[in-house]
Amino acid sequence: MARNRSSRTKKRKKLNIDRGVVHIKSTFNNTIITLSDLDGNTILWASGGTVGYSGSKKSTPYAAQLAADKIAKEALKLGLTRVSIEVKGPGAGREAAIRTIQAAGLVVDSIKDITPIPHNGCRPRRRRRV
C-alpha cells in the first residue's frame, strides 16, 4: 500500500542573533541572495527562480527585488535587525536588491563589493553581438 508522505519541511529553529550578512550574487542569468550569520553559516536563501520566475526573467531587477523582499521579511521574523551586505557579480539585480533590503526595515551597517577581478587571468568569454 502506498504511504501518505508528508511534505519535506524542516521546523525552523528560533535563532538568537540580531546581526547577519546578506550575500547578493548577481550574475547575468540570475540573482541569488543568501542570509548568513557572522560566521558564514547559511540561515536562508532566495533567488529569482525560487520566487517564481524562469528563463530570462530570473535576471531582471524585479525578480531580484522579490527575492530580497522575501529574505528581508524572513530575517525580521527571525529577529534580525542589523545586516551588512556583500555584493558579488555584474548582474542587473544588484541595486534593486540592496534598495529593497534597506526599505524593508533592516538596518544596513555596510555595503561591500566583493566582485572578483582578475589580474589578467583566464581569457574572457567572447563579446556578445546583438
Curated annotation (Swiss-Prot):
Gene3D superfamilies documented for this protein: Ribosomal protein S11
GO annotation (BP), single: translation
Xref: InterPro entries: Ribosomal_uS11 (IPR001971), Ribosomal_uS11_bac-type (IPR019981), Ribosomal_uS11_CS (IPR018102), Ribosomal_uS11_sf (IPR036967)
Regions crossing the membrane: none
Disulfide-bond pairs as recorded: none
PROSITE patterns, A to Z: RIBOSOMAL_S11 (PS00054)
GO cellular component terms given for this protein: ribonucleoprotein complex; ribosome
Keywords: Ribonucleoprotein, Ribosomal protein, RNA-binding, rRNA-binding
GO molecular function: rRNA binding; structural constituent of ribosome
Function: Located on the platform of the 30S subunit, it bridges several disparate RNA helices of the 16S rRNA. Forms part of the Shine-Dalgarno cleft in the 70S ribosome.
Family: Belongs to the universal ribosomal protein uS11 family.
Quaternary structure (record): Part of the 30S ribosomal subunit. Interacts with proteins S7 and S18. Binds to IF-3.
Name assigned to this protein: Small ribosomal subunit protein uS11
Organism: Kosmotoga olearia (strain ATCC BAA-1733 / DSM 21960 / TBF 19.5.1)
